């Protein structure tokens, strides 16, 4: 008879995720995961041929957790502000998972920041289109522009170098969100990247 499987695959992934949350993805080794489970390394290799495969599953679980934060943000009265606030909350509460998803070079475990941006756009697109009356391509560009601001704050947070309060960051997000939305809707060709930059800036700075 084959030996009885003591741990299911999802239990091993959950243990590996706990290690990653506490110590980072590079600490997800067979020994550390086995220690988290309180067993030898044997059960891990019942399900996985390599640790890279397990790390890839940890990354997928990190995405699921991140998605929960984003969906909470989208349920608010001002979707993008809610998304931005939840993104920053994720960085504060799960700094190691944030590093895994957003601050690694693309490899077999994580697709890196640009893949995470696309994942985020896919989550937010429908709400932005519906509430802000944007076509899909404009919603994606709008999200990209605002995400770059939020990414900057989140990176300061996870590197423990953020001097701004939650209120200050929220105010910046509101200002930038309003400015970009207004500009995309009122400056012809801006969202498409085909506008007379000199003329637009000239008219703006010459206002009293």
State each model region's role.
Residues 126-130, 163-208:
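C-terminal peripheral helix-coil segments that are non-catalytic and often amphipathic
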Residues 57, 70-97, 134, 146:
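Hydrophobic alpha-helical connector segments
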Residues 1-23, 30-32, 36, 53-56:
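Basic, helix-initiating cap at the start of DNA-binding domains
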Residues 60-82, 120-131:
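Amphipathic alpha-helical linker/stalk segments
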Residues 37-48:
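Short hydrophobic/aromatic patch on the recognition helix
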Residues 90-109, 153-163:
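Amphipathic alpha-helical segments used for helix-helix packing
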Residues 108-133, 140-145, 151, 171-182:
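Amphipathic alpha-helical packing segments from all-alpha helical-bundle domains
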Residues 20, 54-62, 101, 109-117:
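Alpha-helical DNA-contacting segments of helix-turn-helix folds
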């Amino acid at each position: 008879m084959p030996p009885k499987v003591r741990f299911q695959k999802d239990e091993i992934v959950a243990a590996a995720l706990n290690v990653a949350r506490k110590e980072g993805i590079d600490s997800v080794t067979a020994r550390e995961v086995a220690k988290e489970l309180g067993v030898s390394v044997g059960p891990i290799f019942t399900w996985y041929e390599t640790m890279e495969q397990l790390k890839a599953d940890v990354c997928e679980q990190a995405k699921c957790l991140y998605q929960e934060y984003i969906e909470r943000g989208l349920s608010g009265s001002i979707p993008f502000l809610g998304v931005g606030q939840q993104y920053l909350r994720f960085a504060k509460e799960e700094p190691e998972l944030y590093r895994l998803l957003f601050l690694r070079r693309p490899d077999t475990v994580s697709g890196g920041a640009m893949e995470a941006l696309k994942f985020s756009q896919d989550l937010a697109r429908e709400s932005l289109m519906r509430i802000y009356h944007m076509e899909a391509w404009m919603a994606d560009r709008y999200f990209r522009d605002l995400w770059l601001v939020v990414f900057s704050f989140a990176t300061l947070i996870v590197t423990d170098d953020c001097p701004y309060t939650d209120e200050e960051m929220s105010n910046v997000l509101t200002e930038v969100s309003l400015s970009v939305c207004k500009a995309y809707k009122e400056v012809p060709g801006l969202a498409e990247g085909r506008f007379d930059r000199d003329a637009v800036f000239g008219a703006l700075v010459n206002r009293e």
